[in-house]
């Protein structure tokens, strides 16, 4: 089967310089969702018709199995499909999809193609309470499809018809060249409508069959930012429902966003307003507090993530505790039973089993052993303005509060670092290290007071 995806439109109502089909839904371009669905049908040819912003669209969805046809002037859907003809296999049927209709299920498309067969003509239709703005399916007295009439060309009687054309059709490719060449643009838009091919098919003795989707939202398109937002919420609720069915506890299914893939073990719980991006894997019994953002990360079983924690490109072991207000940046690798507390940032660093940094610290470009305690206000000074260096902290080290470790530096096993120490030289294992300072107490000091106005 050939699949042609129409993606050449300007999308004026989006009021954006970005081509309409590249606006994101769940973190990915609208067109990418359509291509993914098309791939599940195993097409022999997959062609995207581009026009407005053609170079941007090509770059965004380029792949070895995707070919592109250029529609230099947007002269209608029939003209768009005509541009793809040289790339199609004439011996296979052609399914036409739209780059701004991202939620159609593969099962719905399969139902349509099965109904049409190899040489038939199939139209995906839907019945709406308010069909205003859509092309109507006109049937004869026996219920057979006669033609499709666009809203602007429909009579008052035809505008009462509730069954509408979604635009998604499957057609015998070997007949398309003749049909498309016969189209006329004698309509209110002055365009070559793909819908007019229906009458040509009927004239050729081909019965036009129809199929309908399971859900009305499968055929909704995007023409404005409002419609994009509506489809985003539909998609996210569908994702949330799938997670609930799989056994995930979600505090409010209307307040979760998955912009990629989220894999969950058993008894995972997710509080409100959490965002998951890229590929995220949550082990059994993971608990996530409200307002967390997790991107491209793996979280081990039994780990608790408290509110407002941000995690990106990190690996977290089992039974860890993160947050609230913790930040794991790319390259952070935490072993089992580690604790990263409030206002602690970890970047490109490894923390061993049971190590803790509970308050107000920065751990960057570091290798931290097991059972290390990092006191509040500890900073690994990893950057000299031009280069970054690593800090090595071996097992069982106690780092006092307000410590600065100036990399490159190594702290040996079992070292105790006193509060307020700056460590700029390697420390042998087992030592107490401190910077000697004299504490002075002065008498006679008068604290300034505010003047009353």
From Swiss-Prot:
> Hey, which family's this protein in?
In the N-terminal section; belongs to the N-acetylglucosamine-1-phosphate uridyltransferase family.
Active-site residues, record numbering mapped to chain: 359 (proton acceptor)
Q: What is this protein's record name?
A: Bifunctional protein GlmU
- Which InterPro entries does this chain map to? Bifunctional_GlmU, GlmU-like, GlmU_C_LbH, Hexapep, Hexapep_transf_CS, MobA-like_NTP_Trfase, Nucleotide-diphossugar_trans, Trimer_LpxA-like_sf
| UniProt GO BP | cell morphogenesis; cell wall organization; lipid A biosynthetic process; peptidoglycan biosynthetic process; regulation of cell shape; UDP-N-acetylglucosamine biosynthetic process
Annotated GO MF terms:
glucosamine-1-phosphate N-acetyltransferase activity; magnesium ion binding; UDP-N-acetylglucosamine diphosphorylase activity
> Which positions in this protein are listed as binding acetyl-CoA?
376, 382-383, 401, 419
Described by its record, this protein's role is as follows: Catalyzes the last two sequential reactions in the de novo biosynthetic pathway for UDP-N-acetylglucosamine (UDP-GlcNAc). The C-terminal domain catalyzes the transfer of acetyl group from acetyl coenzyme A to glucosamine-1-phosphate (GlcN-1-P) to produce N-acetylglucosamine-1-phosphate (GlcNAc-1-P), which is converted into UDP-GlcNAc by the transfer of uridine 5-monophosphate (from uridine 5-triphosphate), a reaction catalyzed by the N-terminal domain.
Identify which cofactors the protein needs according to its UniProt entry: Mg(2+)
**Region listing for Pyrophosphorylase, in residue ranges:** 1-225
Top-rank taxon of the source lineage equals: Bacteria
State the PROSITE patterns in the record.
Answer: HEXAPEP_TRANSFERASES (PS00101)
Q: What's a GO cellular component annotated to this UniProt protein?
A: membrane
Q: What is its EC number?
A: 2.7.7.23, 2.3.1.157
Q: How does it assemble?
A: Homotrimer.
Question: What is the enzyme's main class?
Answer: transferase
Give the span(s) annotated as N-acetyltransferase. 247-453
Q: Which PANTHER family match?
A: BIFUNCTIONAL PROTEIN GLMU (PTHR43584:SF3), NUCLEOTIDYL TRANSFERASE (PTHR43584)
């Amino acid at each position: 089967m050939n699949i042609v995806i129409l993606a050449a439109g300007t999308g004026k109502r989006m009021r954006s310089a970005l081509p309409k089909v590249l606006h994101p839904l769940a973190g990915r371009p609208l067109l990418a969702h359509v291509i993914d669905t098309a791939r599940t049908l195993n097409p022999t040819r997959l062609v995207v018709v581009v026009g407005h912003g053609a170079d941007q669209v090509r770059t965004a969805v380029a792949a070895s199995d995707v070919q592109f046809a250029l529609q230099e002037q947007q002269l209608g859907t029939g003209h768009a499909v005509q541009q793809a003809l040289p790339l199609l296999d004439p011996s296979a049927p052609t399914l036409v999809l739209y780059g701004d209709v991202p939620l159609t299920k593969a099962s719905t498309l399969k139902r349509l193609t099965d109904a049409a067969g190899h040489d038939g003509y199939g139209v995906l239709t839907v019945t709406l309470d308010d069909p205003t703005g859509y092309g109507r399916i006109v049937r004869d007295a026996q219920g057979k499809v006669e033609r499709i009439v666009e809203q602007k060309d429909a009579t008052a009687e035809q505008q009462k018809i509730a069954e509408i054309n979604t635009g998604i059709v499957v057609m015998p490719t070997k007949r398309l060249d003749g049909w498309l060449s016969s189209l006329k643009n004698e309509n209110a838009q002055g365009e070559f409508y793909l819908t007019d091919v229906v009458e040509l098919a009927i004239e050729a003795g081909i019965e036009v069959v129809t199929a309908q989707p399971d859900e009305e939202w499968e055929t909704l398109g995007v023409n404005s930012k409002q419609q994009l937002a509506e489809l985003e919420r539909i998609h996210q609720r569908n994702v949330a429902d799938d997670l609930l069915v799989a056994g995930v506890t979600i505090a409010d299914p209307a307040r979760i966003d998955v912009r990629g893939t989220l894999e969950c073990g058993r008894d995972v719980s997710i509080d409100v307003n959490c965002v998951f991006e890229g590929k995220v894997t949550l082990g059994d019994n993971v608990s996530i507090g409200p307002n967390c953002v997790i991107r491209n990360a793996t979280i081990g079983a039994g780990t608790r993530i408290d509110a407002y924690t941000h995690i990106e490109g990190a690996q977290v072991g089992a039974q860890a505790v993160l947050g609230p207000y913790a930040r794991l940046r790319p390259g952070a690798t935490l072993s089992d039973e580690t604790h990263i507390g409030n206002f602690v940032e970890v970047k490109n660093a490894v923390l061993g089993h049971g190590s803790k940094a509970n308050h107000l610290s920065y751990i960057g470009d570091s290798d931290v052993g097991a059972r290390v305690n990092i006191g509040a206000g500890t900073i690994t000074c990893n950057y000299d303005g031009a280069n970054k260096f690593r800090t090595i902290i071996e097992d069982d080290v106690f780092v006092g509060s307000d410590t600065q470790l100036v990399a490159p530096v190594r702290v040996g096993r079992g070292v105790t670092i006193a509060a307020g120490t700056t460590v700029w030289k390697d420390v042998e294992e087992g030592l107490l290290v401190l910077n000697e300072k004299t504490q002075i107490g002065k008498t006679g000091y008068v604290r300034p007071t505010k003047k009353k106005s």
